[in-house]
Amino acid sequence: MSAIVDIIGREILDSRGNPTVECDVLLESGAMGRAAVPSGASTGEREAIELRDGDKSRYLGKGVLRAVENLNTEISEALMGLDAQEQTFVDRTLIELDGTDTKERLGANALLAASMAVARAAADESGLSLYRYFGGSGPMSMPVPMMNVINGGAHANNTLDLQELMILPVGATSFREALRWGAEVFHALKKLIHGQGMSTAVGDEGGFAPNVPNHEAAIQLILKAIAEAGYEPGSQIALGLDCASSEFYRDGKYTLAGEGGLSLSSQEFANLLATWCDKYPIISIEDGMAENDWEGWKLLTDQLGKKVQLVGDDLFVTNTRILKEGIQKGVANSILIKINQIGTLTETFAAIEMAKRAGYTAVVSHRSGETEDSTIADIAVATNAMQIKTGSLSRSDRMAKYNQLLRIEEELAEVASYPGLDAFYNLR
């Protein structure tokens, strides 16, 4: 009854108005699963490759009809009749069918859509919520949200080089409370930005994108918003940064246009980040060095790795082979988990498990181009990842994940826990 009997792929639009892939999987029992894949703006060089049409006459070349065609033909034929309850076998079939390391032949967007939709169909047939289907019946932790309130870099048109400045409600006692704190700070920040005569327009991920003089001015604005919302910076709400450093790393230098064109070596940039961490309650830095600057990553880890979460995104691209190398070299202490960087759920879960075994944290993440699909919320709870990064407190594509987490916490009731600072077990 779990046999796959139909697969339907289609082209839909993401939160930026760009095409992406959606997939429906129908089982013999009548159960159905639907999933849509996200897409990133700043992407790592080693990510699995999404297949785009390149036809400039449609969607500026960003159409995904080729990926959809692959889904409706070759992928459909390979998965037809397989047991949807056997996720690992389904994903292995997809990986072998594509036959490339980067999933470029059939497209990571096509493979991931199938992988996710199969899981949703199997959960539907089992009568289970997706997080229970993935994670079993044991106690589960709700994730600490890393809420992007000020955007810069590739996610906004302003003076900031760093891509995200985030708030982390580590002092809350439940996810529901953490979400409320974040929303209240978001609205306090909006009022402050408006009061200073700056635009309150939001970036791709729902955060504001004000033209502040420099990064410290942005940090200070957030701290003021936290205080005005009635919370204590640090003990109740900490800060996080996503530098996306590969975006401004050229010829061995980190050039910060938002800091007056400052050009820094890896050590100098590490020193700057360390200075900010000493001055402000920053407990997490993502992509603090460029993806190819492994020496810089080692410097940063040696300097800050005991007191700040150092998250590898472009560095690791949710890939166990690269993560293993990072663990062996003592680089970073956390991995960002993006399902479309690797292309199947099985490989995603393997990366989370490898990180945990090594004492690294795993932060489940959205992409800048999102949909109403909320699978990552279920993954964060099912794997006890304890941290999620899914944007600001605006835009329905971001709220879809937060609202799903509210539902999950309600369903789990007393068996749900909110870890707060304990989510950062890599800093013990």
From Swiss-Prot:
UniProt entry tagged with the keyword Magnesium: yes
GO BP, sorted A to Z: glycolytic process
GO cellular component assignments: cell surface; extracellular region; phosphopyruvate hydratase complex
Top class in the EC scheme: lyase
Highest taxon of source: Bacteria
Entry EC no(s): 4.2.1.11
Substrates-to-products reaction catalysed: (2R)-2-phosphoglycerate = phosphoenolpyruvate + H2O
Subcellular location: Cytoplasm; Secreted; Cell surface
Molecular-function GO terms, alphabetical: magnesium ion binding; phosphopyruvate hydratase activity
Keywords of the record: Cytoplasm, Glycolysis, Lyase, Magnesium, Metal-binding, Secreted
The record's free-text note on cofactor binding: Binds a second Mg(2+) ion via substrate during catalysis.
UniProt: Mg(2+) binding residues: 242, 286, 313
Binding site for (2R)-2-phosphoglycerate: 163, 338, 367-368, 389
SMART domains reported in the protein's UniProt record: Enolase_C (SM01192), Enolase_N (SM01193)
Active site positions, chain numbering: 205 (proton donor), 338 (proton acceptor)
Signal peptide: none
Requisite cofactors: Mg(2+)
Pathway of action: Carbohydrate degradation; glycolysis; pyruvate from D-glyceraldehyde 3-phosphate: step 4/5
Database matches in InterPro entries: Enolase, Enolase-like_C_sf, Enolase-like_N, Enolase_C, Enolase_CS, Enolase_N
Covalent S-S links between cysteines: none
A Pfam family reported for this protein in Swiss-Prot or TrEMBL: Enolase_N
Family label: Belongs to the enolase family.
Function in brief: Catalyzes the reversible conversion of 2-phosphoglycerate (2-PG) into phosphoenolpyruvate (PEP). It is essential for the degradation of carbohydrates via glycolysis.
Protein name from the UniProt record: Enolase
